[in-house]
Amino acid sequence: MWNKNRLTQMLSIEYPIIQAGMAGSTTPKLVASVSNSGGLGTIGAGYFNTQQLEDEIDYVRQLTSNSFGVNVFVPSQQSYTSSQIENMNAWLKPYRRALHLEEPVVKITEEQQFKCHIDTTIKKQVPVCCFTFGIPSESIIKRLKEANIKLIGTATSVDEAIANEKAGMDAIVAQGSEAGGHRGSFLKPKNQLPMVGTISLVPQIVDVVSIPVIAAGGIMDGRGVLASIVLGAEGVQMGTAFLTSQDSNASELLRDAIINSKETDTVVTKAFSGKLARGINNRFIEEMSQYEGDIPDYPIQNELTSSIRKAAANIGDKELTHMWSGQSPRLATTHPANTIMSNIINQINQIMQYK
């Protein structure tokens, strides 16, 4: 059976399909629907405060008794100067003026937020905790393991996968360059951050680690799931496939943009957040590209552009807000999450029967 392996057993799920924990875009209905369909629904906790995360977990539990997870951002060392912030504020001034916005006060609460997310995950006994942007400290990993919480790390290179296994992760997401949203890279190479495609990355990671590997990036249907399994993955993580679902928190602006875009429309940019992320190209990205080397690191840039992005989205201006998407938008649908899950499973079973 294609759907029975170490990962499904470890996570107590029927099918090795994980809905990515997309911060700002998941809803209790989406998470529970995926879990009720036999996959692993994941709460995108990245931007939640403690109360919001507690409420989200409680709501998910009202909708499902099945396993689910929480995805959290691991804090990173920020590298920026006051002149970078001053320059960026000057460059962003025309956008703020056009949208009638004040210059924001930057508040960095990453460390405290992360600690609260971990405390809440343990307090609420969430079955699975997924990490992106790095690996948590040894003490945090120990606390989570003592609470019998399964840990899933993210890797965009073989070296990052090895580091995840060494740190004690129970499974690893191999995030290919096709993936939408933020890159999970955390080891800084000599030249540039890894941009290795899923079909290349997965088998190379599988060959050097002993824990289950989860393929991510460009996977939208049963064909992608089966291809990943053939490459040695024991599961897949899908983001964009569920982002356009009517159960997600995506705006109609974003949903329509993805549904109507093509595979050549996305780019990888730091313009919105200070961290590389894949999204649909627009005017803001193109105009900010001239400052690429001077953009402050995440979360500084994320704070500086936040009000611009929100205001633009509120008035339906897709040229000034982030439109995260993977490279397979032609395969996106607006079906409910349970329909997406059943379509994937049925397609896999049909292919297996045909073969």
Curated annotation (Swiss-Prot):
Biological process terms from the Gene Ontology for this record are:
response to toxic substance
Ordered alphabetically, the record's keywords are: Detoxification, Flavoprotein, FMN, Monooxygenase, Nucleotide-binding, Oxidoreductase
Q: Which InterPro entries match?
A: Aldolase_TIM (IPR013785), NMO (IPR004136)
> Which sites bind FMN?
71, 175, 180, 218, 237-240
The record's catalysed reaction(s) read: 3 propionate 3-nitronate + 3 O2 + H2O = 3 3-oxopropanoate + 2 nitrate + nitrite + H2O2 + 3 H(+)
EC number(s) stated in the UniProt entry for this protein: 1.13.12.-
What is its cofactor? FMN
Q: Name one Pfam family in it.
A: NMO
Other remarks in the entry: P3N is a potent irreversible inhibitor of the key enzyme succinate dehydrogenase in the Krebs cycle and electron transport chain. P3N has been shown to be a toxic metabolite to bacteria, plants, fungi, mammals or any organism that uses succinate dehydrogenase.
Outline what the protein does: Nitronate monooxygenase that uses molecular oxygen to catalyze the oxidative denitrification of alkyl nitronates. Acts on propionate 3-nitronate (P3N), the presumed physiological substrate. Probably functions in the detoxification of P3N, a metabolic poison produced by plants and fungi as a defense mechanism.
Protein family per UniProt: Belongs to the nitronate monooxygenase family. NMO class I subfamily.
Q: What is this protein called?
A: Probable nitronate monooxygenase
Q: Which organism is it from?
A: Staphylococcus aureus (strain MW2)
